[in-house]
Amino acid sequence: PLALMQAQLELFCAEHPDMPPETADFLSLLQEQTERLSQMTKTLLEMSNLQQVERNESIQLAPMVEEIFTDLTPLAEKSGITLELAGDGVMTGSDALIYRMIFNLTENAIKYNRPDGSVQVCITQEPEKLLILVSDTGRGIPEEYQQSIFQPFFRVDKSRSRTFGGAGLGLALVWEIAALHGGSVRVAESSDSGTTIAAELPRSGNHEAAPKNETL
């Protein structure tokens, strides 16, 4: 139904290029909201199917992050944000899910950054685990919200989320992916000069069943 709605809206707009500005604005809003609902539905389906994903692939993180940077460069360039990578590591897990986890963290750091800021992904490999730090130069997250940001549909700044089309599911999915791999994610530090999110993951593929996210 959502795909049909999107197609019908696009067709109507294409067939009526001379519609009044008020109508065009209204239809544009409808398209934005339909797309947002479609993305929300897709993410919820992904979250419900996480347990079925195989997690036995060997993953080298630095090349993966470089690919993520390539995908997100157009978004970063809009605000003059530089993307930086430090370190590398190898782990066993789901390549697709780890990609999505780091992508979501990096995308979030870009969206809520300051103009001409920077985002750094730092990977540290230890004998038994990996530490992935994603740091930005944004305005920071108030301390009272630092536990809540991993809850589904939670948004610190609703006006900026509307601007970027966020539904408040990106970090909830990050939490679920980390937990599914036997790891964790948290706000390592945050101030008015920026935020660092830390994801800690075991390097081995012996993942236990993911603990339930009590915020869900």
Regions from the PLM with identified roles:
Residues L29-L37:
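Short alpha-helical segment of the dimerization/phosphotransfer core of two-component systems
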Residues E46, L50-E57, V90-A96:
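Conserved micro-motifs of the catalytic ATP-binding
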Residues A109-I110:
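Short helix-loop "hinge" at the ATP-lid/N-box region of the Bergerat-fold HATPase_c
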Residues D136:
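Acidic ATP/Mg2+-coordinating residue in the GHKL
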Residues I141-R155:
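Short conserved segment of the HATPase_c
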Residues G182-G183:
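Conserved glycine-rich
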